[in-house]
Each structure stands twice: as C-alpha cells, then as structure tokens.
Amino acid sequence: EETRVISFHGYGPGPEGIAWKNLRDWITENCYEEMVETQRFFGFNNPNPSPGSENYGYEQWMTLPSAYEGKEGETIKTLPGGLYAVGGFRYSTPEAFGPAWEALNNWRVDSEFVYDESRQWLEELLTKASVLVEKSSVDFDCYMPVIKVKA
C-alpha cells in the first residue's frame, strides 16, 4: 500500500547523522514529537558510495499521517507499496549493516524471489526512542523489494 513520507538528505563521509539531524530538527521545530511513536522511519543510501571516495548520500524518511498536507519547502514523497523480504538486526556500529544485507541477499538467492530493481531497498528504524535522542545501539529491519518468480 502506498505511503506518504517526508524526506531529509545528508551528504558526506557520515551522511546518516546529517540526514537524522535534519529530521530531528524538523520534528522539534514543528513540535511534532508526539508523532514519533505513531510513524515509521526508513532510510537508504542516496547516492551510494563511490570507489575511492568517503562521501556518499543518505536519505531519511518519516511516514506522515494521512491528514498532513505539507508545508512550503518540505520534500513529500510517495513510497510505493509492494512485496519486501525483511531481515532484522541490532546496530551497534556502521559495519553491522553489511552482514545484515548480505544475509538477506543470501536468503534471496535460494528463494523463490528476485530483487525488484524498480523499488528502493530500505532500512527501518524500530527503536523509536532513538529518533529524538541518538542511541549507540538500536534495532533495524532491512527491507529488500522482491518479486515472486517461482511457484
């Protein structure tokens, strides 16, 4: 099912922190702290890291209530629905993401699904308390868009 999100971007050697700071600032500046418990938080590299460069981008999304109309200057997007394979993990260092994605991809190789390149892979933050206060260890789910090809 389609979902509307607000988008924040970061770019540099640690873009996740920049994107999260932009989202946190927007939440506090607009007094939307009460929305944190009822919304979902997704992120992904955008653009991906390039060989030889420590700089890359990260885009952070927060789902929006259906009644939210948006304000001038906000980037509102629609996340398409579809089928995703999901794998969860606990994050304590940035290096934790690689093995989590590798495990999900290894599952896919032997499954009845193929990667759906038309949709974005996502990382969903599950530890809501860390949205407003940065935590060193949080729970994430990795979402790989897939299409079922085998019966």
Stretch-by-stretch model annotation:
Residues 1-151:
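A solvent-exposed interaction/effector surface
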